[in-house]
Amino acid sequence: MNSVSTSAFGPVAFSLGLLLVLPAAFPAPVLPGEDSKDVAAPHSQPLTSSERIDKHIRYILDGISALRKETCNRSNMCESSKEALAENNLNLPKMAEKDGCFQSGFNEDTCLVKIITGLLEFEVYLEYLQNRFESSEEQARAVQMSTKVLIQFLQKKAKNLDAITTPEPTTNASLLTKLQAQNQWLQDMTTHLILRSFKEFLQSSLRALRQM
């Protein structure tokens, strides 16, 4: 899938991302990576909710690409043949046929629940990514904050909130401690696998959301 570049992840975009996740500010008129003229231009048609979510996901994907670039440049993890060893120790969310997000057997309600649940499950892994980058610290934070905003938008779209599973805080805390206690090689590999899996999950989510 070709990601469309939307905006550079600079300090301004990062600060905007932080503002958007404040409860008092939600829903905000402008999403990260979104120009205010896209929302309220006097002589143009404002973006629909679906279009804004689409653009927001592509913004996050751009951030993931920047983080993966740094990861690949500083290590050989992107080419490693030992990925399976580390991947077996992770429980990263993935799309399956039963989730109703694929073209065959598509089910909007079931799929939306899966997307939201998956994003909630990814949050602990996005927390792990914080402080894992030297030159892209703001990008890592922006991806994390923008994902929180995306979850809030999708929850407003969902009809069956009771079906959404939220990870237990104690479970997440235990997992985070375990991941941070790994040796350097495994931490680098975990970072690579999280970014790759999150990219794949968002791409699948984007394709599914375009059918809704």
Swiss-Prot record:
Subcellular location: Secreted
GO biological process: acute-phase response; glucose homeostasis; hepatocyte proliferation; interleukin-6-mediated signaling pathway; liver regeneration; positive regulation of multicellular organismal process; positive regulation of receptor signaling pathway via JAK-STAT; positive regulation of receptor signaling pathway via STAT
Predominant localisation class: secreted
Keyword Acetylation included in the entry's annotation: no
Residues annotated as signal peptide: 1-27
Subunit-level organization: Component of a hexamer of two molecules each of IL6, IL6R and IL6ST; first binds to IL6R to associate with the signaling subunit IL6ST. Interacts with IL6R (via the N-terminal ectodomain); this interaction may be affected by IL6R-binding with SORL1, hence decreasing IL6 cis signaling. Interacts with SORL1 (via the N-terminal ectodomain); this interaction leads to IL6 internalization and lysosomal degradation. May form a trimeric complex with the soluble SORL1 ectodomain and soluble IL6R receptor; this interaction might stabilize circulating IL6, hence promoting IL6 trans signaling.
Function: Cytokine with a wide variety of biological functions in immunity, tissue regeneration, and metabolism. Binds to IL6R, then the complex associates to the signaling subunit IL6ST/gp130 to trigger the intracellular IL6-signaling pathway. The interaction with the membrane-bound IL6R and IL6ST stimulates 'classic signaling', whereas the binding of IL6 and soluble IL6R to IL6ST stimulates 'trans-signaling'. Alternatively, 'cluster signaling' occurs when membrane-bound IL6:IL6R complexes on transmitter cells activate IL6ST receptors on neighboring receiver cells.
The protein, known as: Interleukin-6
Species annotation: Macaca fascicularis (Crab-eating macaque)
Lineage of producing organism: Eukaryota, Metazoa, Chordata, Craniata, Vertebrata
Gene symbol of the encoding locus: IL6
